[in-house]
């Protein structure tokens, strides 16, 4: 299957595009022009590759999780260790690329949104490296959940704006960042943290994150002597780590691709963020994608134990993969993610981010189904340091509830 998405208008099949007001159209067209020029300039990629090697610490290892594999007794599990990047997650791949692009465009200021804080930290890090002014928009609810990352961003010289509109989470931070961009378009670049938003953002983010899948593909061959794994698994909120892993394999049809969505308290409750399980097409933040919405088209509140997954939409390329049945998207509950978090910590000595724990939880199920002759690559998108206190509080609260029930 030849795969050449997006088309010139930024559509992936019927998803994507750029649904933005005139005030933003100039900026996205300017960005697309600058991005095309950078793609055609070998020195841009050379400089970026050097930064990824020397500053970020790429390439990240592809690690055979022998203990986890033996514990489950199913397919071989290989972890793509994005948690070992500088700043602790995959977000730096995109942040560094976009700040370097903004610098080339002559921009002086950087703005970004963040949910779990990882994209905010990565953007603040890249802005510090390139000596650029940086403001991060973060929902007030997430500011509380991720106090440590807020301090990190401020330590790196960024200003953190707590957003008090709406549900005070990621989608509200995106709204605030877009408003700020409209007001300061001449000297400011907006760094979207996931593979969504108006074209060319989904393509730019995908391209900068595709280093994950390109490395993993070659590493798998070097490690196993086999051509391709049987499956790929990654967690999906907006979907940037997943698209980064999936895209280099999209034409390899023997490789099954699975995105683990946040099912929160369950997809049959109102408390989840399982966009492809329960959503339908709609326009959000400048792009046509699957969106959680009510019968009147009002955007529903997304919910997840993981701040990085509670977004009510999903990148348009994921909507397209789902539509053409190239990838499957599966719901994983908070409870299952917590089990994955503890299991990987216990058997491999690796504490994963709550986001990545959704992928681990599904990988455990899939490994049992596939059996020991098969193999899979799981994107370990980030480390769990930021989540340890939250998990501790949650597990203690759960234990107290159980104690009361037995009393």
UniProtKB/Swiss-Prot annotation:
GO terms for molecular function: tryptophan synthase activity. The modification N6-(pyridoxal phosphate)lysine is found at residue 91. Its EC number is 4.2.1.20. It is an enzyme of class 4 (lyase). Pathway: Amino-acid biosynthesis; L-tryptophan biosynthesis; L-tryptophan from chorismate: step 5/5. Its cofactor is pyridoxal 5'-phosphate. Pfam families: PALP. It catalyses: (1S,2R)-1-C-(indol-3-yl)glycerol 3-phosphate + L-serine = D-glyceraldehyde 3-phosphate + L-tryptophan + H2O. The keyword Lyase applies. GO terms for cellular component: cytoplasm. InterPro entries: Trp_synth_b_CS (IPR006653), Trp_synth_beta (IPR006654), Trp_synth_beta/beta-like (IPR023026), TrpB-like_PALP (IPR001926), TrpB-like_PALP_sf (IPR036052). Tetramer of two alpha and two beta chains. PANTHER family: TRYPTOPHAN SYNTHASE, TRYPTOPHAN SYNTHASE-RELATED. Belongs to the TrpB family. The beta subunit is responsible for the synthesis of L-tryptophan from indole and L-serine. This is Tryptophan synthase beta chain. The gene is trpB.
């Amino acid at each position: 299957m030849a795969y050449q998405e997006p088309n010139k208008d930024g559509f992936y099949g019927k998803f994507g595009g750029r649904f933005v007001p005139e005030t933003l159209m100039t900026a996205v067209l300017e960005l697309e022009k600058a991005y095309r020029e950078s793609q055609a300039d070998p020195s841009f990629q050379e400089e970026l590759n050097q930064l990824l090697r020397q500053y970020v610490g790429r390439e990240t290892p592809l690690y055979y999780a022998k203990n986890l594999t033996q514990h489950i007794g199913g397919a071989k599990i290989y972890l793509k260790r994005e948690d070992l990047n500088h700043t602790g997650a995959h977000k730096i791949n995109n942040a560094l690329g976009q700040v370097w692009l903004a610098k080339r465009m002559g921009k002086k200021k950087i703005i970004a949104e963040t949910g779990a804080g990882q994209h905010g930290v990565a953007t603040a890090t890249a802005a510090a490296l390139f000596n650029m002014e940086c403001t991060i928009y973060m929902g007030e609810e997430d500011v509380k959940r991720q106090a440590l990352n807020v301090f990190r961003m401020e330590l790196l010289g960024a200003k953190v704006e707590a957003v008090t509109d709406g549900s005070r989470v990621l989608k509200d931070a995106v709204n605030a960042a877009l408003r700020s961009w409209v007001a300061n378009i001449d000297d400011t670049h907006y760094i979207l943290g996931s593979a969504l938003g108006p074209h060319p953002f989904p393509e730019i983010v995908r391209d900068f994150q595709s280093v994950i899948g390109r490395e993993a593909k070659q590493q798998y061959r070097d490690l196993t002597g086999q051509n391709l794994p049987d499956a790929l698994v990654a967690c999906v909120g907006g979907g940037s780590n997943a698209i980064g892993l999936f895209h280099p394999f999209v034409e390899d049809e023997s490789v099954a691709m699975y995105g683990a969505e946040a099912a929160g308290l369950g997809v049959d409750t109102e408390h989840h963020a399982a966009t492809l399980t329960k959503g339908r097409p709609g326009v959000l933040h400048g792009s046509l994608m699957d969106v959680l919405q009510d019968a009147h088209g009002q955007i529903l509140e997304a919910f997840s134990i993981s701040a990085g997954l509670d977004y009510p939409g999903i990148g348009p390329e994921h909507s397209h993969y789902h539509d053409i049945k190239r990838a499957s998207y599966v719901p994983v509950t908070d409870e299952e993610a917590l089990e994955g978090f503890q299991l990987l910590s216990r058997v491999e000595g690796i504490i994963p981010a709550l986001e990545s724990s959704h992928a681990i939880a599904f990988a455990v199920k899939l490994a049992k189904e596939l059996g020991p002759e098969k193999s899979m690559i799981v994107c370990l998108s980030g480390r769990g340091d930021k989540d340890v206190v939250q998990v501790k509080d949650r597990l203690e609260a759960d234990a107290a509830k159980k104690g009361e029930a037995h009393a």
